[in-house]
Amino acid sequence: MEQIVISGTGVFTPEESITNEELVRAYNEYAENYNLANKNKIDLGEKVALELSNEEFIFNASGIKNRYVMDKKGILDPNIMHPILDKRTNDQPSILAEMSLKASKDALDKAGKTPDDIDAVITACSNLERAYPAISIEVQELLGIKGFAFDMNVACSSATFAIQAAADMIRSGSANTILIVDPEICSGHLDFKDRDCHFIFGDVCTAMVLEKKDTANSSNCFEILSTKCITQFSNNIRNNFGFLNNAKKSSPLDRDLLFMQEGRKVFKEVVPMVSQLIIDHLYEEKIEIEEIKRLWLHQANKSMNDFIGKKVLGRVPEDHEQPNILQDYANTSSAGSIIAFSLYSQDMKSNEVGVLCSFGAGYSAGSIILRKVS
């Protein structure tokens, strides 16, 4: 079977960031204003007073201390509470494409490739800026890449599903070298007026170059030994925004048009599903648990990852074995595990093995077994 490698990764990080302290200050001011404006109805039991937030609650619930965003001014304004992004004409690059370009150039440089070497582009992320034309085709045009491109969405698992799709296409001969981009503006689908989730997400974009091992000349190259993806339908993580909203007479302010989740149910159901996926995947490939030197997991919740790591390894993972970037980036959906992989893979030795795994809405989960080549 043709050996396929990830030969380069790139990360675009927005310039602006928001600390828990800043986020709490803005939310609490909004909540206090809401409670004051609705005092009479709250006293009559017609409305429920909003509970204030605090930094300790956020960190204990998630492990998050900071998040990067495309716009912090609107998010931190108690009268707005959402990012404000400039509207662009059709002749200007879309925001997702612009982010993708920056991450792509980083990945191409690390892989030692130019756009002329790429013959396919996959945009894999949890939220696409528009229905059509595909963001990936725009990225293809802006980079001057020939071949073909397409978008795909499997929520937080999009990047690992894209790795499987790209590896399969290269093996089948559909393409030789593929660029994957994962642009995520998660702040755009987050309700910053909701205490239970206003702290969860951040914005970022990652990129990867996949190619045949024989053509790779990267100094940090990982062979894709095996891929395994699973899905299981659940409403516990949901966003009802879509092209039929107008036909359904939905209001842009409807709560279900933003991110919603049943956090406790998600934790209870996803942790065993993902743990078993990784364990089964390693068993099927006849790889012993002791051989695993690194777990690059989806960065959604530190406690969730701690449980998964302990279940897979049979012990509490050392910090270097299961790198955590949540405290700095928050949940960046499909990009999270790729950030962890990009930042914490160069120290691995030749032939050492690790598992890249992402999981989330759907439910969906993708496991990629990687071996360091160079």
At which residue positions do the language-model features occur?
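Acyl-CoA/ACP chain-elongation machinery
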Residues: D182-P183, L190, Q232-N239, N301-M304
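Flexible, glycine-rich active-site loops centered on histidine and acidic residues
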Residues: S174-C205
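Short acidic, glycine/serine/threonine-rich loops at helix termini
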Residues: S17-I18, Y132-I135, I163-Q164, H189-R195, ...
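Short beta-strand segments
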Residues: S7, A124, N153, I178-E184, ...
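Buried hydrophobic positions in well-ordered alpha/beta secondary-structure cores of metabolic enzymes
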Residues: I6-G8, I58, A107, V121, ...
